[in-house]
Amino acid sequence: MRKLLCALTVMSALVIAVAVSAAAPGNFAGTWTLDKSKSQGLSPRMQNAESVSWVITQTEKEITIEEKVTGGNPPAGGAPGGGGPGGGGQGGGQGRGMGGGFGGPRTFALDGSETSGEMGGGRPAKFVRKATVSADGKTLDLSSKVTFQGPDGEVVSTTTEKLVLAADGKGLTVTRHSESPRGTQDSTLVFNK
């Protein structure tokens, strides 16, 4: 009987330890301001902007990122660049990504499932997004794929972002890789709360 009780106690402790180790995502929510002096590979729009910020809202189930760019002129001869990797919500994101110039909030499910939908605007498009949370909850890997019809056929833009929350929760580093018909862009964005 004692052996059974001891075994049950050990099993219960293991179950509790596993449950605690499956960390929830860190708190990425808040308004984050880009520190251009610490960031690398910024687009001309971001370099010339008066300010760039991310407004992140987060619940247990999802995270939404809205990029806001104030000031700064679009690059000559093209659509504005340097915003988020394709929007996909209705509303006011002013940044435009390399992949087709779609602004607006981007929402990702935090359970690891894909989010898909359609975007309106000048070029109707389809998007697929996925978020993966690290075991410690301090890193979030985001992937986005936007597909739309261009004058020469289907255009695809993909973006991956690794969001790393600082230990004190006051810094956010984003490593971004984007690919589109305009080329490949790698950048590191450093934000402060």
Region roles according to the model:
Residues 7-18:
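Bacterial N-terminal signal peptides
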Residues 23-193:
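PEST-like low-complexity, intrinsically disordered acidic/proline/serine-rich tracts
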Residues 1-7:
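Positively charged n-region of N-terminal signal peptides that target proteins for export
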